[in-house]
Amino acid sequence: MSDQPSTPEPSALEKTQALLASLWQRNLPTLRQRLDTLDQAVAVEPIAPELLNEAIIIAHKLSGSLGLFGHHHATEIARELEHLFRNPSSAAPGRTKFLTQELRTTLALPEAPPTA
C-alpha cells in the first residue's frame, strides 16, 4: 500500500476536452492562415476567381469543423460566408468583409501584423 494520495482518473469528458484543446492548439497556425486568406479575398472587389474558389473551400471547411471545438456562432458565420462566396450577387456590399472580421473576432484571433 502506498502512502501517496491517489490521483483521481480524469473522466471521459475531461479526456475529450483535453484532446480537443490539444487539437485546437495544434491547428491554430492553419486556422490563422485560412483567416488570412479570407482577409485577402475580401480586401478587393471583385475577388479574383482563384481566390474566390479558395475562399469557398476555406469557408466550407470552417463551417464543418469549428462546431467540433464549441465555436457554434463561428460555424454560422462561416456558413454564411460560404453562401455569399458561392453567390456573389447576393452579397450586400461589405457583408463578406464584415463577416470575415466577425469570424476572426468570434474566434479571438487577431489579424496577423503586416509583413514588410
Placement of each model-derived feature along the sequence:
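Long, amphipathic alpha-helical coiled-coil segments characteristic
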Residues: L13-A55, K97-E111
